[in-house]
Amino acid sequence: MKKYLALALIAPLLISCSTTKKGDTYNEAWVKDTNGFDILMGQFAHNIENIWGFKEVVIAGPKDYVKYTDQYQTRSHINFDDGTITIETIAGTEPAAHLRRAIIKTLLMGDDPSSVDLYSDVDDITISKEPFLYGQVVDNTGQPIRWEGRASNFADYLLKNRLKSRSNGLRIIYSVTINMVPNHLDKRAHKYLGMVRQASRKYGVDESLILAIMQTESSFNPYAVSRSDALGLMQVVQHTAGKDVFRSQGKSGTPSRSFLFDPASNIDTGTAYLAMLNNVYLGGIDNPTSRRYAVITAYNGGAGSVLRVFSNDKIQAANIINTMTPGDVYQTLTTRHPSAESRRYLYKVNTAQKSYRRR
């Protein structure tokens, strides 16, 4: 599957950063490649269902880290929204040993997404001296987990005290669930504050907006992927927003997957795209608050789709927006935008940004 993850996605200039298929116009080649990638993901899901059983499909997403090992018989699932880590196995022999190994590796994995293939069962997770989950999880004694000895002891405790099993009619599934600390979201956000501040100064984009976008897109999951092949913390698509940013910076081609999986590069690219939306594509909107609402919505659904809410003529659309109050612009975008996802997106990001502004 790995060789298909870099499928070329050719899209219009004004397409969004994280959208699945929305844009100003449809390019036939882009549609074909997007459909091809979607088909491949469907096949991957079908294979997982054949192995694990009906309604047991779990696949990596923007806010879900999912890694399969042991010929797809063991998986680690971190739900960054709920703050839970679930390790499961259907191994018929020594299931506890499979769980123990997966628990230790998950607790001690690093934060280099480019080194891990989430669509294969290759055991490519390396134990890090600075685990990504350090501080986001504590053991049964309330201590954070950095070293293999503590992780091993915690794994033994979990297997003795929290091991569960269930049958789905096809398999017996053994599992252990670990709850992350209550402020796990803030712990992850803190890792990237320096990068956010640097990008904010470089492009003139408010730190609170960058953080709100990151929270909404990925819950600060650097391993974030999507069925539209959006990558990393700010869910940047290589061949749309990534290509636009590279072009604006005088670079040819598109950013690589490894580039976008690097947190600093991802934040820089996502922030550069926000600046392009604000200063170029939606620069005709005078009121900064109205323009911010438009930029947020456009990051998800494309600048063209935002303007078409007001008029099919882009210049006229900006003129109409300039006659409206920011409150009316917000109300219009959250009720009249054709995409329900984009309508919800503006609400989520705006709410998150308010919380970061209060800090």
UniProtKB/Swiss-Prot annotation:
GO biological process: cell division; cell wall macromolecule catabolic process; cell wall organization; cellular response to antibiotic; cellular response to oxidative stress; peptidoglycan catabolic process
Covalently attached lipid (N-palmitoyl cysteine), positions: C17
Upregulation: By SoxS.
Signal sequence annotation: 1-16
A Pfam family hit: Mltc_N
GO molecular function terms listed in the Swiss-Prot or TrEMBL record: hydrolase activity, acting on glycosyl bonds; lytic endotransglycosylase activity; peptidoglycan lytic transglycosylase activity
Main localization, broad class: membrane
Membrane-spanning segments: none
Gene Ontology cellular-component terms listed: cell outer membrane; outer membrane-bounded periplasmic space
EC nos: 4.2.2.n1
InterPro entries, per the entry: Lysozyme-like_dom_sf, Murein_transglycosylaseC, Murein_transglycosylaseC_N, Transglyc_AS, Transglycosylase_SLT_dom_1
Family as reported in the entry's similarity comment: Belongs to the transglycosylase Slt family.
PANTHER family: MEMBRANE-BOUND LYTIC MUREIN TRANSGLYCOSYLASE C, SOLUBLE LYTIC MUREIN TRANSGLYCOSYLASE-RELATED
Protein name: Membrane-bound lytic murein transglycosylase C
Organism: Escherichia coli (strain K12)
Upper taxonomic lineage: Bacteria, Pseudomonadati, Pseudomonadota, Gammaproteobacteria, Enterobacterales
